[in-house]
């Protein structure tokens, strides 16, 4: 192997010590330089991306959408970096403080995790997002992207490292693995001497592989089998607009819905309107027998597998239920604990949905597409966690920190 992960890990650990001591003003100055360099080197980044796109000509459209970079997306990346710079620095924040019975002053203080490992697929924006968030939270990061985006990731990382050097920061705070073999990926996932946490972003298959292989602690950023439930007290216009937005605005991402659940009392009236709007975008409709009776040849019969499939495409599975309890049970059985929405004008039923749905983000009368660090005001996000330990939902700066207890005394000894 030409890549020495132990050397990369050692270098990242050394860089992380410098980052942990940086003040907020310096961090923000560095991030502004990173944003400026991304914009200044846009042509170089797009040229590198073109090489990756040429090598991916046989890939599906949804894959190409995630891989492609243009001036607008680079501008969005730079804006994301600037958003991170504007956020309050969590490092050094005191979560709690008290004096115990012995007169010890105890504080619970926010500190960096240390060295973060990222494994992701054809999403070059993750390179920028992860670098900015890790830097602002005082962490070094080692990036392992998919082979399909290798040239883009190498170029973006080079631009970021140059910006760090301009500001007198150890460039090894941001490193990319330039070899994409499975053997090296497995070694990376077991780099316990240097990595404090591993964060995968990508398909359900990638995330499961990381969970099965890693010895480093993992924050699971799960796949997105998300639902909209149209309650019997839903506003029809809202049901049509939210369902359509949640499915078609960007179907290749994890917060797009895959399943629509609708109450039988409004299905006869609402479903044709929803179907007509979805079919304007050539969405393929799959449904249970009742759905097919209502929609006729507009829909095909769904299989059991459809309810558990993350399509990331213009396909939706539709289920008619007889009660809100059936809707909740169905969603909890088939979801990936990501994002779920109810459309209803009934407050009591909305509260029931909020209380009983097991997911990182639960919406009332809004699209699941808002599950995003930028939309939540976190700036860029490191991922969307679907687990319950350490972090859950869109992961911003605080999710990349831990705590330490600082205790000050004046000679106390325990008796």
Curated annotation (Swiss-Prot):
PROSITE patterns reported in the protein's UniProt record: PROA (PS01223)
Pathway: Amino-acid biosynthesis; L-proline biosynthesis; L-glutamate 5-semialdehyde from L-glutamate: step 2/2
One of the GO BP terms on file: L-proline biosynthetic process
Location in or out of the cell: Cytoplasm
One Pfam family, short name: Aldedh
InterPro entries recorded: Ald_DH/histidinol_DH, Ald_DH_C, Ald_DH_N, Aldehyde_DH_dom, G-glutamylP_reductase_CS, Glu-5-SA_DH, GPR_dom
EC numbers: 1.2.1.41
SUPFAM superfamilies: ALDH-like (SSF53720)
GO terms, molecular function: glutamate-5-semialdehyde dehydrogenase activity; NADP binding
CC per GO annotation: cytoplasm
Entry-linked NCBIfam families: PRK00197.1, proA
HAMAP family referenced in this protein's UniProt entry, alphabetically: ProA (MF_00412)
PANTHER family named in the record: DELTA-1-PYRROLINE-5-CARBOXYLATE SYNTHASE, GLUTAMATE SEMIALDEHYDE DEHYDROGENASE
Name the UniProt record assigns to this protein: Gamma-glutamyl phosphate reductase
């Amino acid at each position: 192997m030409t890549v020495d992960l132990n050397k990369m890990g050692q270098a990242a650990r050394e860089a992380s010590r410098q980052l942990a001591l940086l003040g907020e003003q310096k961090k923000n100055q560095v991030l502004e330089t990173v944003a400026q360099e991304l914009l200044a080197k846009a042509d170089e980044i797009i040229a590198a991306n073109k090489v990756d796109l040429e090598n991916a000509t046989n890939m599906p459209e949804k894959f190409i959408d995630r891989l492609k970079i243009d001036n607008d997306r680079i501008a969005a990346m730079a804006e994301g970096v600037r958003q991170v710079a504007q956020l309050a620095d969590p490092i050094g924040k005191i979560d709690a403080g008290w004096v115990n019975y012995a007169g010890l002053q105890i504080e619970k203080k926010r500190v960096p995790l240390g060295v973060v490992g990222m494994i992701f697929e054809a999403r070059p924006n993750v390179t920028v997002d992860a670098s900015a968030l890790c830097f602002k939270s005082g962490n070094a990061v080692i990036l392992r992207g998919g082979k399909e985006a290798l040239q883009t990731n190498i170029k973006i990382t080079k631009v970021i490292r140059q910006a760090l050097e301009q500001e007198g920061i150890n460039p090894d705070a941001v490193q990319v693995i330039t070899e994409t073999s499975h053997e090296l990926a497995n070694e990376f996932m077991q780099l316990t001497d240097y990595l404090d946490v591993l964060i995968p972003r990508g398909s359900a298959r990638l995330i499961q592989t990381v969970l099965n292989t890693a010895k480093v602690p993992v924050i699971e950023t799960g796949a997105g089998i998300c639902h909209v439930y149209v309650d019997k007290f839903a506003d029809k216009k809202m049901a049509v607009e939210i369902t359509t937005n949640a499915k078609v605005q960007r179907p290749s991402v994890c917060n797009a819905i895959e399943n629509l659940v609708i109450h039988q009392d409004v299905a006869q009236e609402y479903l044709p309107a929803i179907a007509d709007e979805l079919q304007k975008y050539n969405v393929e409709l799959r449904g249970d027998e009742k759905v097919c009776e209502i929609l006729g040849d507009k829909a095909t019969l769904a299989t059991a597998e459809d309810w558990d499939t993350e399509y990331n495409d213009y396909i939706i599975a539709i289920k008619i239920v007889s009660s809100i309890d059936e809707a909740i049970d169905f969603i909890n059985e088939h979801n990936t604990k990501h994002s779920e929405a109810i459309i209803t004008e009934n407050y009591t039923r909305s509260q029931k949905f909020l209380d009983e749905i097991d997911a990182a983000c639960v919406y009332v009368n809004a699209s699941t597409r808002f599950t995003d660090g930028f939309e939540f005001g976190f700036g860029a996000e490191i991922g969307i966690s679907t687990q319950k330990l350490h972090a859950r939902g869109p992961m911003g700066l605080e999710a990349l920190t831990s705590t330490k207890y600082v205790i000050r005394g004046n000679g106390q000894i325990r008796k």
